[in-house]
Amino acid sequence: MKLKWPNDLLLGGTKFGGMLSVADQKQSFIVVGIGINIGWAPEAAAKLADLSDDPSLTPPVFLGELLRQISDLEKLSNERLHELYVADLATLTRIVQIEFTDKQVVVGRAVGVNPDGRLLVQTEQKLLTIETGDVVHLRDAGGE
């Protein structure tokens, strides 16, 4: 399993889930949603059942394990969480295309993630700090 910046979950390079969060303007609260394909997936998507033939992998079992892991993550420092996130990030080193809501498109190499979670993309002209946008993986450092 790998992550695609900022919030997609990948199995073998194919999306099987994602996270979405929305805050009010004052940022006094955040609503977080998680969608994960467990036993079924739309066409061209992956599902967790692809990893195992274990019939005990049901939504309630998965939810219990997810909550346990979230509890473990809550005990970690921000620095350690950042390290773990970056270690599992499939986006790094790849040539990416960032599509912004204003229809602007930028192409460059994903070179890092800053401590605030923003993607660092090196274009031919400069290093950009990306806060939001749709990311398309074009190829990795080896040209794939």
What name fits each language-model region?
Residues L3-N7, G12:
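Alpha/beta catalytic cores of group-transfer enzymes, especially the acyltransferase/condensing modules
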Residues L11-E144:
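Long, positively charged amphipathic alpha-helical accessory segments at protein N-termini or as interdomain linkers
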